[in-house]
Amino acid sequence: MESNFNQEGVPRPSYVFSADPIARPSEINFDGIKLDLSHEFSLVAPNTEANSFESKDYLQVCLRIRPFTQSEKELESEGCVHILDSQTVVLKEPQCILGRLSEKSSGQMAQKFSFSKVFGPATTQKEFFQGCIMQPVKDLLKGQSRLIFTYGLTNSGKTYTFQGTEENIGILPRTLNVLFDSLQERLYTKMNLKPHRSREYLRLSSEQEKEEIASKSALLRQIKEVTVHNDSDDTLYGSLTNSLNISEFEESIKDYEQANLNMANSIKFSVWVSFFEIYNEYIYDLFVPVSSKFQKRKMLRLSQDVKGYSFIKDLQWIQVSDSKEAYRLLKLGIKHQSVAFTKLNNASSRSHSIFTVKILQIEDSEMSRVIRVSELSLCDLAGSERTMKTQNEGERLRETGNINTSLLTLGKCINVLKNSEKSKFQQHVPFRESKLTHYFQSFFNGKGKICMIVNISQCYLAYDETLNVLKFSAIAQKVCVPDTLNSSQEKLFGPVKSSQDVSLDSNSNSKILNVKRATISWENSLEDLMEDEDLVEELENAEETQNVETKLLDEDLDKTLEENKAFISHEEKRKLLDLIEDLKKKLINEKKEKLTLEFKIREEVTQEFTQYWAQREADFKETLLQEREILEENAERRLAIFKDLVGKCDTREEAAKDICATKVETEETHNYVGFEDIIDSLQDNVADIKKQAEIAHLYIASLPDPQEATACLELKFNQIKAELAKTKGELIKTKEELKKRENESDSLIQELETSNKKIITQNQRIKELINIIDQKEDTINEFQNLKSHMENTFKCNDKADTSSLIINNKLICNETVEVPKDSKSKICSERKRVNENELQQDEPPAKKGSIHVSSAITEDQKKSEEVRPNIAEIEDIRVLQENNEGLRAFLLTIENELKNEKEEKAELNKQIVHFQQELSLSEKKNLTLSKEVQQIQSNYDIAIAELHVQKSKNQEQEEKIMKLSNEIETATRSITNNVSQIKLMHTKIDELRTLDSVSQISNIDLLNLRDLSNGSEEDNLPNTQLDLLGNDYLVSKQVKEYRIQEPNRENSFHSSIEAIWEECKEIVKASSKKSHQIEELEQQIEKLQAEVKGYKDENNRLKEKEHKNQDDLLKEKETLIQQLKEELQEKNVTLDVQIQHVVEGKRALSELTQGVTCYKAKIKELETILETQKVECSHSAKLEQDILEKESIILKLERNLKEFQEHLQDSVKNTKDLNVKELKLKEEITQLTNNLQDMKHLLQLKEEEEETNRQETEKLKEELSASSARTQNLKADLQRKEEDYADLKEKLTDAKKQIKQVQKEVSVMRDEDKLLRIKINELEKKKNQCSQELDMKQRTIQQLKEQLNNQKVEEAIQQYERACKDLNVKEKIIEDMRMTLEEQEQTQVEQDQVLEAKLEEVERLATELEKWKEKCNDLETKNNQRSNKEHENNTDVLGKLTNLQDELQESEQKYNADRKKWLEEKMMLITQAKEAENIRNKEMKKYAEDRERFFKQQNEMEILTAQLTEKDSDLQKWREERDQLVAALEIQLKALISSNVQKDNEIEQLKRIISETSKIETQIMDIKPKRISSADPDKLQTEPLSTSFEISRNKIEDGSVVLDSCEVSTENDQSTRFPKPELEIQFTPLQPNKMAVKHPGCTTPVTVKIPKARKRKSNEMEEDLVKCENKKNATPRTNLKFPISDDRNSSVKKEQKVAIRPSSKKTYSLRSQASIIGVNLATKKKEGTLQKFGDFLQHSPSILQSKAKKIIETMSSSKLSNVEASKENVSQPKRAKRKLYTSEISSPIDISGQVILMDQKMKESDHQIIKRRLRTKTAK
C-alpha cells in the first residue's frame, strides 16, 4: 500500500493554509538558491517525483499527406514532400517562384522533419485509424482521457480524416463503432447517472430522467425529419456498417475483450455524447437547432471547475445506446455546422468543431456507483488561410481572421510550453487568449494525453504554408504533456471493491489533490491563479468537506461491511481499518512536510528576487554616472575651444607688423581662397545631388509593383484557362446531347413503326365488327316488324272480350318491355304451380303480385263455385301466356345479343379514341422530331459561329505572341546596346584613371601646398624665413619679432582647418564605399548578361518544340477529319431511315382518316336507332295516359304516373344533355378531321423542307466535320499556345524586371557621368586658378625681392598690417562657413531620413569627389614646388582634357540618341500591349455576351419543352375526361333503359291490379246479399270494401299488395296472418326531410317536415345501443310463422335497389292456437297498430328516429273512435300467456339509417334474451 500511495503522479497541491498549525522552521539554509534543488525534493518525496517524470509523455504527432487532385496532377508531376521512412519526411524547396511567397530562398534546398508516425497519400482510412487512433480508443475504454485534434491548411483533408464520406468513413464513426462493438452487453441502459462539468456526475431523479428521454426522442425526431428530405439514415448506417465489416475490427475487439475480462462483470458503461463548435470565438451547441423566430443560436459559456479543468456550461449531453444513434446525432450536428464556399475549398469548415464522448464506469449493484469518468475529445480544427489565395471578403474574411488568431494562440501556447521546460523560470502560457486554447488548457495541464494529426498537401503552390505547418508540428512534438489525472485516478480508485461513489458534493480527495500550486508546479496561465483570500476560503471549505466525507466514508464502509458479512471476515475488517488509519497519518505527515518545503522555496525565491533587484539598481546607477561624465567632458571641451578662439582674436589685434609675416600671410590667404572655392563647389554638388535624388525617388514611386503586375497577369491567365475549360465542357455536352437526340429519334421511329402495325390490325378488326353490327341490325329490324304485327293482332281481339283484353294488354306490355330472364322464368313457374294446386284442390286461383302476393279469401267453397265458369278462359289465357313466354325468351336472347353488340361498339369506340390518341401522339412526336432537327441545325450554326470566333481569337493570340516575341527580341537588343554603352563608359573611366596617374606629378606640388596650409608642422616657417634672410639680411630682425606673435594666430587657424580636414576624410570614406558598390553592380550586370544568354537558348528550344508540336497536330487533325467523315456518313444513313419511317407514318394517318369517316357514318346510324327507340318510349307513355283517362276511379295511379313523368322529364333532360354532348363530340371530330387535313398539308410542306434540309444537313455535316476537326486542332493549339503565352508572359515579366534594373543602372551611370563631368570642369577651373595663383605668386616674389632691395621697412609694415586685417576678415568668413557647414549637416541628416534608398549613390559620389580633391591638392603642391618646369606639362594635360571633354560630349550625344530610340521603342511596346489588352477585353466581352445568349437560348428551350410537356399532359387529361364522359353517358343510357324496363313492369303490375280489383268488385256485388243475411252485418259491409281499397292503395303506392287482417291465404297448407294497416307513410330518398302521412279515412296524404337529427356522441351512442337492444327484446314476437313464397323471394331479389317498407310484425292477443281462423280474425286489438308502427319505425331510416313520437301522437286522435267501436262489437279473447312488450310505445328509435331490410327469420341471441325486460302490468 505504501508503494502505491507514494507513486502518485498528482500535481503537488498548496498546503499553505492547513487546519493543523505547523511551526515555521527556525533555521533554513539559503546558500544554494541557484543550485539544483532536485536533491532536496528527492529527499522529501523521491518516489512521487520519479513517477511524475515517468508519467510525462511527449505530444504524439501523426502526419498525413493528402494525394494530388486531378487539377494538381495536370499542373505538377512531383510534389515538394518526400517520405524517407515511417517517421521522417523531407520538404524540398520548389524551383519555381510561384511556390514561394517571398523571392528570397531560405538557404536550405531540403529540410527534414520527424514525426511519431507518417502516413503517405496511399494510406486508407482503415490503416490510418488502426495506426493512429486505435490506441487512444483502447485507453478510453481503460478509463483514461484523451484529446485528438487535426491541424493544417484549408483543403488539406482534415474534415475527410475526421468525418470521411459515406463510402470511406473517417475517424469519428469508426471510433463509435469500435466502442460499441467492444462494450456490447456491458452498456448501462438507465439514464439516472449523467456526466456533469469535466470529471463529475449527477444522479438524476425520475422526473429528470423522463426529461432526458423526452429530449433524446425529440432530437431523434429531428433527425427523422431531416432524413425525409435527404437520404434515409438506414441507408447511411447501412453504408457505414458495410464499410466497417466485422473483419476489420476483429483484432481490436479481441484486445478489448482481453482488457474487459480483467474487470468485474458488475461493471457497466454509460456512453454520453456532445457536439459543439467554436465559431468567431463564440461557442454553439450543434445539437440545438437555429430558432425560427430570431434566426440565432444560443451562445454557450466556457468556465472552469474548482480543479481548474475547463468545461462548457449548459452543453447538451445525450446518452447513446448504439453506434447507429451516435452516427445519426453526428449527422445532425454536421447539418448545423457552419460551412462556407471559398476559392480553395467548396465546403470549407468555418469553425472548430469538437465531438466529445464521455464514458461513466458504473458498478451496477443495488445502489449503482460511478467508479471512473473517462473522456475522448475529437476536434476538427478549421484550417489556416491566406487571403491572397482564398480571396475572401466580408464575413468570410472575418471568419478567417478569427480562425488564424485562434491557431496562432495555439502555436504560442505550444511554443511557450516547449521553452518553459528548458528554462528555470516558468513562463506565462496565454491559454485565455482564445476559446480553443482555453478548452485545451486542461489537457495540456495533465487531464490526459494529446494526439495531434497534421494534414498537409504535397502541392508546390502551398510550399510556404506547409513549411510553417511542419515547423509548428516539430515544435509541438517536443512538448511534454503530463498525464497526472489518469494516473491519479488509477491510484485513487484502485480495484472495484474499494472504489467510492463520487458525486457533485462529495469529491474532496480529487479536489485537494488537483488544486494547482503556483510554486512547485509553476502554473502555466496567470489567469488561472487565484487570489490568496479565495485560496484560503476554498482550501478551508475543501478540508471541512474532506473531514465530513471521511466520516461519511467510514460510515459507508461500516455499512457495506455489515451487509457483506458472509464474504468478508473480521480479520479483513481490522486490516482495512488499520490501513485507513495509516493512510490518514501519512496524509497528515505529508501535509506537514509539504508545508515546510513550500515555505523554504518561497523564502528562497524572495531572496533571489531581492538580490536580482539590487543588482539591477546598481547597474542603472553606474550607467547614469558614465553618461553624466561624458556629457560634462564634452561641455568642457566645447568651452575650451570657445575660449581659445576668443583669445586668439584679441592677440591678433595687438600684434605688430612684419614684412616677412605679410608674405607668409599672403601665401596663406591664397590657400584659404582655394578652400573657400572647394566649399562652394561642395554646396553646389550637394544641391545637385538633392535634386537628382528627388527625381529618382519620384520615378521609383511612379513605377508599379512587379508583384502586383505579375499577380494581375496570373489572374487573367487563370480566367482564360477556366473559360477555355468551360468551352470544352460545353462542346462535349453538345456532342452528348446530339448523340442522345439521335438515339431518341431512332426510338421514336421504332415506336412509329409499331404503332402503324397496331393501327392496321385494329382497322381490320373494326371492319369485321362493322359487318357483324350490320347483320345484327337487320335481325333487330325483323324482330321489330314481328312485334308490330303481334300488337295489331292483340288490338283486334280487344273488341271481342273485355276481360281477356286486360290480360292481353298486360301480356303485350310484357312483350314490349325488356325484362331480365331470371325474374320472368320464376314468375311463369310460380303461376304454373299455383294453377296446378288449384286444379287438384278445385279451388279458385290465387291472386298474384310482383312484390307481395297476398290474395285472401274468406269462404273457399263459395268462391270456387263462382269462379268455375272462368276456368276455360283461364286455360286460353295460359296458352297465350306460354306463347308469350316463348316469344319473351326469344326477345331476351335478342336483347342480350344487342347488349353484347353495344358493348362491342363501346369497345370499338374506345379503340377508335385510343387510336386517335396514338395518332395525336405520333403527330406530336413528329413535331418534336422536326423541332429537334431544327435545334440541331441551330446548334450546328452556333457551333460554326463559335468555331469562327475561336479561329479569330486564335489568330489574334498568335499575333499577340508574335508581337510579344518581337518585343522580347527588341528588349534583348536594347539590353545588349545598353551593355555595350556601359562597357564604353567603363573604358572611358579607365582612361580617366590612367590620366590620373599622369597627373601625379602635379599632385606632388598640391601636396606641398596642403602641407603649407596644415599648421601642425612648425618647420615650414623657419625654412621660409631662411629663404628671406638669404635675399635681405635687414628684414631678419622684423621677422624675428613677427615669429613671437605669429604662433598664437596660427594655432587657432590650424584647429579650424583640422576640423574641416576631418570632414573631408569622412567624405573620402563614403566615396570608397560607393566605389565598392559600383564594382558589385558591374558583377550583377555580368550575371544579367549570362541570364539573357540562357533565356535566348530557352527561346530557341521552345521554337523547336513548337515546330514539332505543329507537325503532331497536323497528323492528329487528319485522323480526326477522317473519323468525322465516317460519323457523318452513318448519320446520313440514319436520317434516310427516319425519313422512310415518316412516310410510312403519313400513310398510316391517311388510313386512319378513312377509318374515322367510316366510324362517323356508323355513329349516325346508331343515332337514328336511338331516336326510333325514343319514339317507341313516347308511344308507350301515351298508352299509359290513355289508360289513366279511362280509369278515373284510381286517383293515386295518376299521381304515381306524374312522378314517373317527372323522372321521364329528367331522363329527357339527360338525353338532351347527351345530345348536346354528342353534338360537341361531333364538332370535335370535325375539328380533328380539319386538323388532320392541316397536318397532311404540313407534312407535305415538311417533306419538301426536309428534302431541302437534307441537302443543307449534308453540307452542314461536311462543314461540321471540317469545323469540328478544326476546332479540336485549334483547341489543342490554343492550349499549347496558352501555355507558351504563359511562359512568354513570365519571361516578359522577368525581362521587364531586368530592363528596369538595367535602366536603373544606366540612370545611375548617367548620373555618375554627369558628376564626373562636373568634377572635371571643377578640376579644370581649379587648375586655371592654381596657374593664375602661381603666376601671381611668382610676380609677388619678384616684387618682394625688388621691394626688399629698393623699398624700406615701413612699406613692409604697412603690408603686414593689411595682411593682418585680411586675416581677421578671413577668420570671420571661416566661422560663417562653419555655421553653414553645421546647417548643411542638419539638412543632410533630414535628407538621409527622406532618401534612405539613395544614400549609397550619394556616398559613391562623395568618395569620388574626395579622390579628385586629393588629386587636386597633390597637383597644387607639385605646382608650387615645380612651377617653372610644369607649365609645359600643364599645357599638355589641358590639351588632353579638352580632347576628353570632346569625346565625352560625343558619347553623351550618342547616348541621348540611343536613349530616345529606346524610349520610343518602349512607348511603342506599351501602346501595342495596351491595344492587345483592349482587343482581348473586347473578345472576352463578346465571348461573355455569346455565352449569355447561349444560356438564354437554353433556358428558353427548357421553358418551351416544359410548356410542351404541360400541353401534352393537358391533352391527355382532356382525352381521359372525354373517355370518362363517354363511359358515363353509356352508363346513363343503360340506366335509362333499365328504368324504362322497370316502369313497364310497374305499368303491368298496375294493370293486373286493376283487373283483379274489377273482378273482386263483381264478386263482392254478388256476395253482398248473402253476407247481409248472416251475422254481424256492419262488419260484413265495412271490412271488405276497406280491405280491398287498402289493398289497391298499398299496391299503387308501395308496389306491393298487403292483405287485410281478417283474410287468410292458404298456400301449401300454411296459414299466414297479416295486420290491417292503420296508417300509410310515404317518403323518398331524394327528399329525406319530407314524409307523406295518410290516415285511413282521408283520401289525400298530409306532408310532414322532419328536421335533421343531431349527431350524438360516442357515449350516448353506446347507451342508446343498450336501450335499443332492450326495446327490441321487449317487443313480443309472434308465434305464427308466415310462409314466404318463392314469388316473394323472387320479388325481393328483383327490387333490392328500392327501399322496401316492411309490414309491422306485432300480432294481437289470441284466445288459443286451435280456435277457428275466422273467429280469431274477428277478435283483434286496435292497440297493436301503434306498436306495429313503432316496430316499423325501428327498422326505418335514421330520419324518422327523432320524430317518431310526434307522428304517433298525431295519429292517436283519429284512431280512438275505431278502437272503441271494435271493443264494443268484438268480445275480448282470453289471455293464454303474458307476452313481453315495451311499455313506452312512442320511445325514440335508435337504428342506423343504412339498415332498410331486416331479416324476418333472425333469432335472438342468449345475450339479448338476458337483456330483455318484463313489461309492466297494465290495468284492465
Curated annotation (Swiss-Prot):
Residues 1050-1107 are annotated as: Necessary and sufficient for interaction with SHTN1. ATP binds at residues 152-159. One of its GO terms (molecular function) is ATP binding. One of its GO terms (cellular component) is centrosome. Residues 58-479 form the Kinesin motor domain. Phosphorylated during mitosis by CDK1. The modification Phosphothreonine is found at residues 560, 1644. InterPro entries: KIF11-like, Kinesin_motor_CS, Kinesin_motor_dom, Kinesin_motor_dom_sf, P-loop_NTPase. Belongs to the TRAFAC class myosin-kinesin ATPase superfamily. Kinesin family. This is Kinesin-like protein KIF20B. It comes from Homo sapiens (Human). The lineage of its organism: Eukaryota, Metazoa, Chordata, Craniata, Vertebrata. The gene is KIF20B.
